[in-house]
Structures are given as C-alpha cells and as structure tokens.
C-alpha cells in the first residue's frame, strides 16, 4: 500500500514522502492516526502543488532577505547613550537598542535576535555588527556609540 506521510514518522520517513507499507500497518495504524493519507492520483497531484508552493515561498523569503541585506550592508547606526569618564557607558548598548535604532533611523524592521552581538557594548566608539537575516544571507553594519 502506498501512502503519503502527513508528518514525520520514526523509521518510516518525513512529511511529504511517498512510502510503501504493509496493508495491515496502513489500515490499522498509520491511516487511523492521521499520520498518512492514501497515495491516490488526486492526492499525489495535491502533494506536487503543495511542494511547488512551498518552493516558491522559500524562494521569495530568500529574495526578501537578500533585498534587506543589501539595504543593511554598509549603513552606520548612531546610538546615543549616557557615558562617564573614559568613554565608559552607564549601562550597555544591547541588540534590542540597536534593532530599535535601525527601525527608527532607517525604517528597516529586523528582529533583535538576528543581530549577532557577542557581548553588550559598554564603551563609546565604532563597532562592526553582523546581522544574520536568513541562513544564507547576512549583512554587516556599523554601530557608532556616541555620548548624549
């Protein structure tokens, strides 16, 4: 019996795979639990359509990420913070502050978790920061921390 898996099944396959299983296993376990559907011509056609839509969606996400990466690359973000003697900040500049400043200054909304900041910035100066927008796309921007 050929079935199309609706979700990942251990020792059988991943979602969307077409697998050949025993009649009893399919009728008594896999189909009643909703783990798979029968591989009829209509269901196979539907599966192909879903895979094509998913591929288009992933391609669009990649294009959007590349576009955002191009906009972010090379920009300099000015973050104002209170500083004491020797250029040490009262507090620190974090991913959240950088994300808010980029959105305010340039209108580009990027999740704060995408900014790769090894540790918070605690002194005045220029800092290069990598933004991991998509697994395949990253951009480098500069953060300039200035005193208020």
From Swiss-Prot:
Keyword rRNA-binding: yes
Keywords, sorted A to Z: Ribonucleoprotein, Ribosomal protein, RNA-binding, rRNA-binding
Pfam family, one: Ribosomal_L9_C
Function: Binds to the 23S rRNA.
Keyword Iron: no
Organism lineage string: Bacteria, Bacillati, Bacillota, Clostridia, Eubacteriales
Family membership: Belongs to the bacterial ribosomal protein bL9 family.
UniProt-recorded name of the protein: Large ribosomal subunit protein bL9
